[in-house]
């Protein structure tokens, strides 16, 4: 049984077939393998909601995966009694004060009870080794929110299209339902999407973030580079993270800790034998930035004309209006300078969801994000893009590498005060789980970036076993293998672990066992059989 619920500004209906009301026509086509819904209106029509529900027989031991909204959103297999927590455990005044509902989907998706879970763009039901994949082929017209209700035995599709105005044709849903083994269903899904396999090599590298965080300087970068001197094998990339700029948004104004500028830093990295990489958040502007002070008209604004906050990082930040010609001209100047003048060849582009914090009258949230990703690809030219903090589907086939989990933390579970917050909060355990459960994206959509591993003893709260578990998982499933350690300071024992980790890759994995309470990974290191076990509760 299938039910379509369609609501516009002046019409609503529930039906299970195609139909027409005045100037609005809808065409619903269903089969066992594909479901599509297309609208046509002769006059401008405002959509309020489009929901399509059909039956699915969940079984007691099924494992369910629903892709989270963006890079950082926790995305793991759950049992049929699983639940996703929203911000309902956090006082509203705290949510509003720190803009905690901006990182994920809390402002535009309702969360359900136990056994009611949702995701974006695609998801699957795994029954032992047999997969049933539900995948949207029509994401640019609006994000498809996919819901599993295991108590009701239903699958629901919802279009993120509230307030969208259209005239003419509008494809709401185009869903494929694929059955088979893991590789079978995902190979076919990405073939249908028209996304060519990602052939980029696995990158090894160093990033400055998880040691000094924003407190980097020319001196600290030089010291980190010196740490690699004399290494048997240099990493591919040395990436300078946040902390060099005056403020987020002021990309061409360096702070006092970088008096010689970023071209000088890139030259030093090249001279050391590595590819220069740099961090940018191109669609974000910090409240205290020169950009916000001098160009308030560049900011995204809500229906009340107020700047749209994107979160509480730094001094708080706003999203930029990517359709403003002056914003686009500024971003072109930034990318031309960073790539062509300074010489950075890998761009870590972060907080990208800031572009689509609010939809436009004539563009859904997804359309805005797709436009934003095309803009970045054009601006970057032949520089490598490592996407981060981005809704995933718009980045498929656009970025070369992409973060597929939240930030790791110096302890295992993340800070206790942050755990009840949104699903994007930093946590080593959560990002490790995302690395495993989003493994199907690696080599298909891009090469996966699982975030860094750390083996060091100083400035560290994880046990040695936890550190080595993270490093092994990153190597087994990642297309990026970065650290923030001073590798030159490793003793012989840590150097041996580092060299052993570098030899691991996906071909070493022999089996993955996932239950509602734990994840077990079986793999080989040469002739040695090994396994890793991680709690998923």
Please state what every model-predicted region is:
Residues 34-35, 468-470, 474-482, 513-537:
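Carbohydrate-binding surface patches
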